[in-house]
Amino acid sequence: VYGGQAPFVFPANNSQDDIAALKAIAEANPLNSDLRNFISNKDYLKDRGSNDGYNVGVTWNTESTSRVKSFFIDDGRTQTVTTMDVSALSGLEQLDLQNTRLKSLDLSTLTKLRSSSLYGNDSLTWFTVKLPNSLPENFWMNGYTTIMAGTPVDGNNAYAAAGTEIDLSAYATVGGVKSVYQWYLIDRATGKRTK
């Protein structure tokens, strides 16, 4: 106690439904040690963001029964997250998924969702993400998915001979918005982009 002031810590009343949903996500991805540790160490009770050096985390809102406000996974280390049911996280406002192996994602029940970042997820495309019917005016969604075209060299690279036609017509527009493509020429010896 300093100067007549004492710190107070109020026990959180975290939503048991949200905790059960987080546990179910971990159970559905048994090969992911980050999710397993997140649950077994009860790290889900701590607010932590994606910039805090962790691969999995949540923040809770300040309602009397706290709901998960944000949830993130960066699965770049193991790439073992293959399924994700976030439908029970009804208070979710921000979702950040990176480097997973998800093939689809249903966000349709998340009516409070304000932003979603989906970077480097194996085959998750804008076609395979189901959004809520009614989105907030300033909804923010960003990210990228690498689509292999040509002959694969490894899990991240492919090549195509000059003049090879690559059909991307299926990805020309998403929800009426034209897609943007970036092409790179990589020096295979150095791995550096030349064009």
Positions of PLM-derived features:
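N-terminal capping/linker segments that flank leucine-rich repeat
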Residues: 1-90, 94, 129-195
